[in-house]
Amino acid sequence: MNLKTVFRAAAVFMGMWILGMWFAPELIMDQYGWQYTPGLTMMMRFMGLSMAALATLHWLIPEWSGNNISKFGMVSGIFWALFGAFGVYDLALNNVPHNANTIIGAVINFVFAILFYLNSKKEAK
């Protein structure tokens, strides 16, 4: 696996969340035990748009970055680790239910962080 593949896989993973936020917000809210409200639904649409921007950047960074891809990979890895840390934090404080979706979601964020880090180190050599 190379860094370009990691960026693309991350974009696809975000794409699944984007679809959920735009077309099945109730399903997403149910996973986290949130009450369905019109305000939260509207916020999910905007979060989906923000995630679409990030997914687009993840998809295009390998094309734009040239020899600097490892620098982008390191920065991306830091943010993926932060997303994972927030997931663990919310689990620890019981802000979200302890179920497979929330636990696996945090783990996947850490997996992407590790993949970005390892592949960035490999590309930098």
Model regions: which residues?
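Membrane-helix boundary elements
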Residues: 3-6, 14-41
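Residues within membrane-spanning alpha-helices of integral membrane proteins
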Residues: 7, 11-14, 48-51, 73, ...
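Core segments of alpha-helical transmembrane spans in multipass integral membrane proteins
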Residues: 16-17, 40-62, 75-82
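Membrane-embedded alpha-helical segments of multi-pass transporters/permeases
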Residues: 22, 59, 88, 113-117
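Non-cytosolic membrane-interface motifs at loop->transmembrane helix junctions
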Residues: 33-41, 71, 96-106
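Juxtamembrane helix-break-helix junctions at the cytosolic face
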Residues: 57-70, 91
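Membrane-helix boundary connector in multi-pass membrane proteins
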Residues: 63, 85-102
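Membrane-water interface at the C-terminal end of transmembrane alpha helices
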Residues: 109-125
